[in-house]
Amino acid sequence: MRHYETMFILKPTLVEEEIKSKIEFYKEVITKHHGVIETSLDMGMRNLAYEIKKHKRGYYYVAYFKANPSMILELERLYRINEDVLRFIVIKYESKKEVEAWHALVDRANKKPSHAKEKHEKTEHTHSHHTEETESVGSHSK
């Protein structure tokens, strides 16, 4: 089995149930063809770098998996025929150095919660807002 990473972007117009259904479908494609999903990242709704099919946002999903090369053609075919997939990519890790990098990515993905960045930003925003209030109170007492 070879090491792979896949990422796909779904249309932002899909409801939550449809998104979950699409993600499960592609996970099943990998596992039905004797692939093993090591880890995945549900990156959620994000802005696109440029407009794709009149959409400015998309739902990102990444999976790191091991599979036989013959399965990749079927996975890519299924991405292409699904109108809800805006973009996709499948990356193959071949050399020893690339496989080590793949393992590092898997380890990092397993340690980091999928929405940790959003939680961190909310915490920073709350903290900076609190600091501004404290500074304004202090300046009135002078």
Swiss-Prot record:
It comes from the Bacteria. Gene3D superfamilies: 3.30.70.60. Signal peptide: none annotated. Keywords: Ribonucleoprotein, Ribosomal protein, RNA-binding, rRNA-binding. GO terms for molecular function: small ribosomal subunit rRNA binding; structural constituent of ribosome. Residues 110-142 are annotated as: Disordered. One of its GO terms (biological process) is translation. GO terms for cellular component: cytosolic small ribosomal subunit. SUPFAM superfamilies: Ribosomal protein S6. The keyword Cytoplasm does not apply. Residues 110-133 have a biased composition (Basic and acidic residues). The keyword Ribonucleoprotein applies. Pfam families: Ribosomal_S6. Binds together with bS18 to 16S ribosomal RNA. HAMAP family: Ribosomal_bS6. Belongs to the bacterial ribosomal protein bS6 family. This is Small ribosomal subunit protein bS6.
